[in-house]
C-alpha cells in the first residue's frame, strides 16, 4: 500500500465581534494550521463612544457621568479615578469620611467585577455552577449600591471633593454582614473549581506570561501580579483611605491562567478585609469638601431653557484660575479591577478640560492577545481572553 501524505489545511477564521466568549464586541482574525493558531490579529473599536473628545465640550462636573460608561462593571472606580485627577489638579482635599466611603464603594465594585469575571470565565471553560453562585452574590451587592446611589451599575456617586450623599447605618450593617460571610462563599467557588480536572488541565501551564514580558507589555493589575510582579497603585501611590488600612497584594509564580485566577480569588478576601476595616474605622464629619465643584440647579422649574438644562458649574472660570495655572497638566491613577486606570488632564484656565486622556488597562491588555494565542490551540483562545479580563467599553472608550 502506498503511504498517503496528509496535508494540514490552512484556514483563516473570524472570532467575533459577536462571539459570546469575547466578553464584548472584540473581533479576532485567526490564521490556523489545523487546530494550532499561527497568527492572531485583534480588531477593536466597535464600542468606541469618544469619551475623551466628549469631555472637551463638558465641564469637569458634567464629564463625570461619561466615565461610568467605560468599564461598566466597576463604574464606581472609574468615577473615583476621574475625581482623584481633578482634585489633584485643583488642590482639593476631601474629608476623611468621604475617603473611607469611597474606599468601601471601590472595593465593593472590585468584588462585583471579579464576580462577573469568575462567573463568565468558568462558564467559558465549562464550569456552569460557579456562574449561578457568583451572580447570586453579585446581586446582593448591586442592591446595596442601589440603596445608597439609586443605581446598580452606572452610579455616578463620587464627586470632585467627596461623595454625593452619606451612607446610613442600615447600609453599613448589611455590608458588614455580607463581608463577614463572603470568605466562605469564595471557598464555595474554589471547591467547585479547584478539584475540577478539566479546569486544571485548561488553565495550568496555558497562556504563560513571564515577569519580564508582563512589564514590557505594560500589563497591570492581576494580569501583572499573576506573573509575580509586585505592583499595586493602592500600595505605591495611595489614594482615598488605602494608606490607613492593612491589606496584602496577592502574587502568582508561573504567570499562567491558573495563577491569574488565584490572584483574583485572593483579592476577594483582601477586598473584604479592607471593607471591614473601613466600616469599623469610619469617622464622623462632612462628606464633601468646602471648595468642591458643584452644580447650580435652575432657579425655577417654570423657566427651564436649553442653557438651564446643561447645569452651570458653581465654581466659575475665575474661581478655577485661583487653583490652577494656564495649561497645567496632571496625571492620576487608581487601581481598577483590571489594572491601573489613569487620567491625564490638561487644563487651559477654563471650566472644561483642554484634553483628557484615559489610560485604560483593558486597551493595554488586549495588545497581549497575539502573544498569548499564537502557537496555542483554538480552544485556548477563550481561556486566554477570560484570564486577562478585558471590558471592551473601557478598551474602546
Curated annotation (Swiss-Prot):
Record's superkingdom? Bacteria
> Care to name a GO molecular-function term for this sequence?
NAD binding
A matching Pfam family: Complex1_49kDa
Keyword terms, alphabetized: Cell inner membrane, Cell membrane, Membrane, NAD, Quinone, Translocase, Transport, Ubiquinone
Instruction: Give me the segments passing through the membrane.
Output: none
List the catalysed reactions: a quinone + NADH + 5 H(+)(in) = a quinol + NAD(+) + 4 H(+)(out)
Q: Which SUPFAM superfamilies match?
A: HydB/Nqo4-like
Please name the InterPro entries in this protein's record.
Answer: NADH_Q_OxRdtase_suD, NDH1_su_D/H, NiFe-Hase_large
Give the EC number(s) listed in the UniProt record: 7.1.1.-
Compartments in which it is found: Cell inner membrane
Keyword Cell membrane attached: yes
Note the topology in the membrane: Peripheral membrane protein
What GO CC annotations are associated with the protein?
plasma membrane
Keyword flag Membrane: yes
Family, as annotated: Belongs to the complex I 49 kDa subunit family.
Q: How does it assemble?
A: NDH-1 is composed of 14 different subunits. Subunits NuoB, C, D, E, F, and G constitute the peripheral sector of the complex.
> What does it do?
NDH-1 shuttles electrons from NADH, via FMN and iron-sulfur (Fe-S) centers, to quinones in the respiratory chain. The immediate electron acceptor for the enzyme in this species is believed to be ubiquinone. Couples the redox reaction to proton translocation (for every two electrons transferred, four hydrogen ions are translocated across the cytoplasmic membrane), and thus conserves the redox energy in a proton gradient.
Q: What is this protein called?
A: NADH-quinone oxidoreductase subunit D 1
Which organism does this record belong to? Thermodesulfovibrio yellowstonii (strain ATCC 51303 / DSM 11347 / YP87)
Taxonomy-wise, where does this protein's organism fall, top ranks first? Bacteria, Pseudomonadati, Nitrospirota, Thermodesulfovibrionia, Thermodesulfovibrionales
Amino acid at each position: 500500500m502506498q503511504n498517503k501524505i496528509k496535508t494540514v489545511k490552512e484556514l483563516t477564521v473570524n472570532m467575533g465581534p459577536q462571539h459570546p466568549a469575547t466578553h464584548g464586541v472584540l473581533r479576532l482574525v485567526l490564521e490556523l494550521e489545523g487546530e494550532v493558531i499561527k497568527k492572531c490579529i485583534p480588531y477593536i473599536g466597535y464600542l468606541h463612544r469618544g469619551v475623551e473628545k466628549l469631555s472637551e465640550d463638558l465641564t469637569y462636573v458634567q464629564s463625570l457621568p461619561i466615565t461610568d460608561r467605560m468599564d461598566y462593571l466597576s463604574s464606581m472606580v472609574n468615577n473615583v479615578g476621574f475625581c482623584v485627577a481633578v482634585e489633584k489638579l485643583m488642590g482639593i482635599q476631601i474629608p476623611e469620611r468621604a475617603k473611607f466611603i469611597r474606599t468601601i464603594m471601590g472595593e465593593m465594585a472590585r468584588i462585583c467585577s471579579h464576580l462577573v469575571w469568575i462567573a463568565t470565565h468558568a462558564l467559558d471553560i465549562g464550569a456552569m455552577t460557579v456562574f449561578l453562585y457568583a451572580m447570586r452574590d453579585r446581586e446582593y451587592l448591586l442592591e446595596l449600591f442601589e440603596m445608597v446611589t439609586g443605581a446598580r451599575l452606572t452610579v455616578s456617586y463620587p464627586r470632585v471633593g467627596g461623595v454625593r450623599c452619606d451612607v446610613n447605618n442600615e447600609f453599613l450593617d448589611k455590608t458588614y454582614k455580607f463581608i463577614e460571610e463572603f470568605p466562605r462563599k469564595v471557598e464555595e467557588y474554589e471547591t467547585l473549581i479547584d478539584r475540577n480536572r478539566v479546569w486544571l488541565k485548561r488553565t495550568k501551564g496555558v497562556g504563560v506570561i513571564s515577569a519580564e514580558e508582563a512589564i514590557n507589555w505594560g500589563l497591570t493589575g492581576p494580569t501583572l501580579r499573576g506573573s509575580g510582579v509586585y505592583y499595586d497603585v493602592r500600595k505605591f501611590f495611595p489614594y482615598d483611605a488605602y494608606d490607613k488600612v492593612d491589606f496584602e497584594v496577592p502574587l502568582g509564580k508561573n504567570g499562567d491562567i491558573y495563577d491569574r485566577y488565584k490572584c483574583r480569588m485572593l483579592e476577594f478576601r483582601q477586598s473584604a478585609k479592607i471593607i471591614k476595616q473601613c466600616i469599623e474605622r469610619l469617622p464622623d464629619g462632612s462628606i464633601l469638601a468646602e471648595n468642591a465643584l458643584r452644580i447650580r440647579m435652575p432657579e425655577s422649574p417654570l423657566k427651564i431653557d436649553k442653557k438651564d438644562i446643561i447645569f452651570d458649574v458653581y465654581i466659575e472660570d475665575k474661581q478655577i484660575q485661583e487653583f490652577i495655572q494656564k495649561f497645567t497638566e496632571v496625571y492620576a491613577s487608581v487601581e481598577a479591577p483590571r489594572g491601573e486606570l489613569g487620567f491625564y488632564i490638561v487644563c487651559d484656565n477654563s471650566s472644561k478640560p483642554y484634553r483628557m486622556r484615559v489610560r485604560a488597562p483593558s486597551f493595554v491588555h488586549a495588545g497581549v492577545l497575539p502573544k498569548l494565542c499564537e502557537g496555542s490551540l483554538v480552544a485556548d483562545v477563550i481561556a486566554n481572553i477570560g484570564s486577562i479580563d478585558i471590558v471592551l467599553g473601557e478598551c474602546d472608550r
